C-alpha cells in the first residue's frame, strides 16, 4: 500500500517538473520570437512611410477651433515668409506704417503677426548674384523693364535656381561647357561676349584665335549674360573686362522655396532653359500694373495659392522652379 502511495507522489512530482520544463521552454521560445520580431520592426521602420493618425494641433494662441486629422500641417500656421521688393515701392508708398498694415492684411489670410518679413533691395542685378533668402518661403517682386526683357528672364533664372560658380581667367585658358547645366555667367555695366570654338588642334572653327574681330558675338552691351555654347568643345572667350566679369557656373537645381512675381509688362517672361520643353507659363499670375499698393494687395490675396506650389526649404533636383507674373 505504501509503495503505491510513493509511486503516485513520485509520478505527480515528475509531472510537475516536466510541466515546469515545458513552460520554461515555451517562454524562452516566445521570448526569442518576440525579440526577433521587434528587432525586425526596428530595422525596417526608418524605411517605411505610413499614415499618421495622430492629431496635429498647431499653436496659434488659441485652440477654440476644431482641427481635422491630417499628416501635413497648414504651412502658413507654422512657417515664415519673406517678401522682397524694390526700394522704389517703399518710396512710392511713403508711409511709415505700411509694413504693419500689410502684416494685418496677411493675418486675415492665416499668417500670424511676426511671420511675414519685408526686405527691400536697391538693384535686382546685385540681388540676383547672391540672394539672401532667409525664410521658409521667399517671394521676390521684380518690376518689369521693357528695356531689358532678356536680362529679366536671366535674372529670374539666377534667383530661382542655385548655382555653383568659379572665376574664369580667359586670358590664359580655354574653356568648355561639360553639360546643359554648365553655363558662363557674365555681369557688369556693359557686357559684350565673343567666343571662338576650337577644334582638337586648338585652331579656331570659323574664326582666328589671334583676331577677336573674327569671334562670334553671343551678347552685345548687356548687363547680364548667361552664355550657352556647344558642350564638349573648347572655346576662346573675349569680354570687355573693364566693364564686365565672367564666371563658370553649374546649375545645382531649383530653389523650390522661392517664387518670383513679375510686376507689369505686356507679356509673361519665359525662363525655360531647354528649347525642347513646353515654356514655363502655366504657373504665371497676371494683373494690370497700377500702383505698388495695388501690387501688394494682390500679393496678399493670392499668397496662399503661391505657397501651395512651393516647397518649404527644399531643393529637390527633380522639381520645377516657379515663376509668376502679376
Curated annotation (Swiss-Prot):
Residues at which Ca(2+) 2 binds: 177, 228-229, 301
All disulfide bonds of the chain are 82-135, 165-249, 191-244, 196-207
User: What InterPro entries does this protein map onto?
Assistant: VP7 (IPR001963), VP7_1 (IPR042207), VP7_2 (IPR042210)
Listed GO CC annotations: host cell endoplasmic reticulum lumen; T=13 icosahedral viral capsid; viral outer capsid
Protein residues bound to Ca(2+) 1 = 95, 206, 214, 216
For this chain, the family text in UniProt reads: Belongs to the rotavirus VP7 family.
Record protein name field:
Outer capsid glycoprotein VP7
From which source organism is this entry? Rotavirus A (strain RVA/Human/Venezuela/HN126/1983/G2P[X])
